[in-house]
Amino acid sequence: MTPWTRRRFLGEASCSALSGVAVLNTLLNLKLAERASAQGAPNDYKTLVCLFLNGGNDSFNWLVPRDAGRHAVYATARGNLALGVGDLLALNQTPEGDGQLYGIHPSCAGLQELFNGLGGDAGKRRAAFVANVGTLIQPTTKAQYLAESVPLPRALFSHSDQIDQWQTSVPQGMSELTGWGGRAADVLHASANTGQTAMGISLAGNNLFQVGSTVRQFVITADGALTLAGANTDAASDPLNPLRLKNAAQKSLLEQHYAGLMAESFAQLTKTSLDAQEFFLSQFNSYDDSAVAGLFPGGNFLARQFRAAAKAIALRPQLGLKRQTLFLSYGGWDHHSE
């Protein structure tokens, strides 16, 4: 497929007077709004689970060519990090692969089963690779980079900026303050969801991916919703719990009206967050998670995140969610110290 030039994209979109960032956001939001308007309130449920690999996954040793010619090119480029053909887990050929042979890292047996349709998902291909994708504005050679003859992302090679670019889908600049998951929630949340829980739930702290112009992300942990220090949701129903008066005092302060706009906004935001936290935690703690406990065995950080995500998905009727994004993260994916 012939790559689109920036000029061609702007011209064919009839938006040549707009910047690249404005065009991107406008087109994506218009498309989402068009579909949401046409479909009305959805009757089905869909969620997007984003596992963000902090540090940069070494994808050159994840998906590797197995045919002799291309493997030789790969081995030359990787040096002593290269994997032998015999070490790779073979992937079945696909119509999209043009007959080329690939394998994956020997530690990824589960991914091989998902791709090839083996194991518990026999006959169902549940994994795909989207290759040659990055934060460049357009395909760029080393010579073009050195000559600065093509548009380049700002702060190229800066890990923190590239994280922002992945999560905003805007490589052209660092001024975009919303993520593409958040922009989707701006359009979809009000029409698809009825509960007080946010469409975007994060198990990895605050992130740019779920930040929207009008919506907020809801941050939880593997054990449920975050609470204020010393707060206890069980105290409200227990007259003998010493935290009951403390909780009541906190809510009373938040329900006051303040003259200052900042103080009033902070109080309202905090109260809304606490109400959402209490509701979510009551549902989360009362859910029988035996059905999801075996899906992600182990006590490691990633398994605990996935179990909590599975519980959040299972609670969708109680939370009033038909469209949802879940954000998880896992780090340590680089060779800087090796």
Spell out what each predicted region is.
Residues 1-338:
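Feature for exported/extracytoplasmic and membrane-associated proteins, marking the mature portion
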